[in-house]
């Protein structure tokens, strides 16, 4: 079954067109990586998929239904977004933040139901946060906070998970934690994932396919190795990169001049 079908998608801001005629599909249970340089339209695409923006033209089909036909509450039960910035201004506990993900299921600001608590317990378990349930989010590391945002999204019990730069501002150890968590969720729960990132190195070993955007257009869509083809990447990023084969697939590095 197709989770998403995008047909002729355009979006414009006042200062110009951001997306130009995107066409692609995402199968249920797939991890799709969306990559590209700054201003390629990656985050705009996510905002269109969760309907915080309305496209200028084109169609988005979500699990076989046009996106505008989804009631807001039903959409929030189906699609969850983990934003790039995991900022929480107040010292809510991890449990309280994750419980916020149950709002679309009708709990509101009343007492949580047994179903709410069971969903939160499962989300904490899947993200390895059970031992931190009572800790203030403001006391956590960057990687732990990112996992809290992921757990909150999982508490929504979505069918589609949207991730905006999930490893941004994290050190290598915390990046590995977050990526391993995403891979396990897809593998064990069959969750469909669309991951947006500047970092092409998250694709090998995680993404089933990758979509490369440039200036709002699809430059390449296919297997990760096809998208990380050196000549193609140099056409986008110039000679400032090099591509090397690693144990899990190709890796991209900044090209450093010889000493």
Locate the predicted segments by residue.
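The feature captures the beta-strand-to-loop junction immediately N-terminal to the Walker
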Residues: 35-37
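Helix-to-loop junction immediately C-terminal to a conserved catalytic motif
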Residues: 50
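Conserved ABC transporter NBD signature motif
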Residues: 58-66, 75
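Conserved ABC ATPase "signature" region
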Residues: 99, 114-132
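Conserved ABC ATPase signature
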Residues: 136-140, 144
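Conserved catalytic motifs of ABC-family nucleotide-binding domains
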Residues: 157
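Catalytic Walker B motif of ABC-type/P-loop ATPase nucleotide-binding domains
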Residues: 161-165
């Amino acid at each position: 079954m197709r989770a998403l079908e995008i047909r002729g998608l355009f979006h414009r801001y006042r200062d110009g067109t951001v997306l130009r005629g995107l066409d692609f599909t995402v199968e249920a249970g797939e991890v799709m990586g969306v990559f590209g340089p700054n201003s390629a339209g990656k985050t705009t695409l996510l905002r269109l998929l969760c309907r915080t923006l309305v496209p200028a033209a084109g169609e988005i089909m979500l699990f076989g239904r046009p996106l505008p036909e989804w009631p807001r509450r039903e959409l929030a039960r189906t699609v969850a977004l983990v934003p790039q910035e995991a900022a929480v201004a107040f010292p809510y506990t991890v449990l309280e933040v994750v419980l916020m993900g149950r709002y679309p299921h009708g709990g509101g600001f009343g007492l949580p139901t047994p179903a709410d608590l069971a969903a939160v317990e499962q989300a904490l378990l899947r993200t390895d946060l059970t031992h931190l349930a009572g800790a203030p989010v403001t006391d956590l590391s960057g990687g732990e906070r990112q996992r809290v945002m992921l757990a909150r999204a999982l508490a929504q019990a979505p069918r589609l998970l949207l991730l905006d730069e999930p490893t941004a501002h994290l050190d290598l150890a915390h990046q590995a934690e977050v990526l391993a968590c995403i891979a396990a969720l897809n593998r064990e729960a069959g969750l469909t994932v669309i991951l947006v990132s500047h970092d092409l190195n998250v694709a090998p070993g995680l993404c089933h396919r990758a979509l490369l955007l440039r200036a709002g257009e699809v430059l390449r869509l296919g297997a990760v190795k096809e998208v990380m083809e050196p000549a193609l990447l140099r056409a986008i990023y110039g000679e400032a990169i090099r591509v090397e084969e690693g144990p899990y697939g190709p890796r991209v590095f900044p090209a450093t001049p010889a000493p």
